């Protein structure tokens, strides 16, 4: 499988969060409702494939009751915030991150991690 995103509205750079690693930023001003698809691989929860990809458990998105999406592109670069500018939108087995507000160019994009991910990254105490 070749992951070849053709998305040109974003770039990856050092996060504005101290010790946050890299983050996802806008190259241009964007409007509320603009969105992009989180590209990746779907695996069944608790399957052999899920167990074999445990190294990325903290980054998996739950899609419905039985599926997990392992992000392979820019969707996996958005960091956590309790005041996010992105929300998750599901369409069947597809996941999109959608802007919840207008943002200027060079804005870092955030969504709120699940409680599981917040705990795994040590964010619940912060």
Q: Language-model segments: which ranges?
A:
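Conserved catalytic SET/PR domain of SAM-dependent protein methyltransferases, capturing the structural core
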Residues: 1-126
């Amino acid at each position: 499988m070749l992951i070849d995103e053709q998305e040109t509205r974003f770039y990856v750079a050092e996060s504005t969060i101290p010790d946050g690693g890299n983050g996802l930023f806008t190259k241009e001003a964007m409007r509320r409702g603009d969105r992009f698809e989180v590209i990746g691989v779907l695996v069944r929860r608790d399957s052999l494939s899920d167990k074999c990809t445990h190294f990325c458990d903290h980054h998996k998105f739950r899609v419905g009751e039985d599926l997990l999406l392992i992000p392979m592109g820019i969707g996996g670069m958005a960091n956590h915030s309790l005041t996010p500018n992105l929300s998750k939108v599901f369409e069947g087995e597809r996941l999109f991150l959608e802007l919840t507000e207008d943002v200027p160019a060079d804005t870092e994009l955030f969504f709120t991690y699940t409680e599981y991910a917040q705990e795994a990254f040590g964010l619940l105490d912060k």
